């Protein structure tokens, strides 16, 4: 049996699956098996790699914290509720400032007491809102988002009371 024909008959997908299960040393030795294998091993798709790290996020104690992209940085937002756990009283946001040092900045926004909130599966729901222009979606849920979190320089005390803390 011609060994060159056998190696060439193995599909690239099967070959990649085999290589992913081998050690680096074994992969390096297999470059000399055939020209096709050597070209696959040198291709950018095979040699690219990503580095992942774990981040200490002790600020996120609750499962209701949502991870967000805040101006290109990792952020997390959640709501603090009153003692009954029904009405949100604070919107809290953490932003990862330094990945290496695990430094987080914390921003707390006190929600106005004048707004009537409704319990809505751990989301902020405000009573008395009207959706206009969504006739095609009458039988579906409509979500309205207020963009206070994006603008940390809001100075209107009637809307938000902000305190910025450094959390290391």
From Swiss-Prot:
UniProt protein name: Putative F-box protein At1g30945
Organism, scientific name: Arabidopsis thaliana (Mouse-ear cress)
Domain F-box: 5-52
One Pfam short name: F-box
Upper classification of the organism: Eukaryota, Viridiplantae, Streptophyta, Embryophyta, Tracheophyta
